[in-house]
Every structure is written in C-alpha cells, then in structure tokens.
C-alpha cells in the first residue's frame, strides 16, 4: 500500500508567513492502523504536523497508538494536543503549539 498525500495534505500559511504541512489521518479499519501509525511517524520526522482521528478505533488500541505517537513526538522535540474527543494534533519541533487556557478534552 502506498500513501497518497494529495487528499490529506494541507499547506497552512496564516501567521507570520510561516508555512508548515499538515497530514490528516483517519484509519477506518484495524488493518490500516499500523500503516497510518508509520505514516504519522514519518511525517513528524520530516517536520510535518499530523492530525490523527481515533474515531473508528477501540479504546485499548487507540490508547496504545496515542502513547506511541506521544512518545515519538516528545522524542523528536514536538508537542501534541487534543483538539476534541478522539482527535489529536501532533506537531514537530519547528511548530509551536499554543492552546487556550491549557484546556484539553478527555480522550473519550
């Protein structure tokens, strides 16, 4: 399976004319999870932000994926935040994340 960034890849240019890329991932089947996890890690490694949607993943597996992504993001010097229930945003070290009042929704 080859990954096609064309449908899930965005350029963001709003603040200070700085651009960064965002990869949006939403695995629908359990068989896709390992593939999407590797794609998200590769994207972070090359300084792309990742939005990962856990909506169709059962809690125990979603928690393991979240732990893996959070650990890898931390190791690469990046940051993460929960946008809403089951939707997380991971950014590389080149992007500074600012969340209002540090209010983070619970995972589930």
From Swiss-Prot:
Keywords: Cell cycle, Cell division, Cyanelle, Plastid, Septation. InterPro entries: Cell_div_SepF, Cell_div_SepF/SepF-rel, SepF-like_sf. This is Cell division protein sepF homolog. Its main location: plastid. Belongs to the SepF family. One of its GO terms (biological process) is cell division. The lineage of its organism: Eukaryota, Glaucocystophyceae, Cyanophoraceae, Cyanophora. May act as a cell division protein. Pfam families: SepF. The keyword Ligase does not apply. It comes from the Eukaryota. GO terms for cellular component: cyanelle. It is found in: Plastid, Cyanelle. Transmembrane segments: none annotated. The keyword Cell division applies.
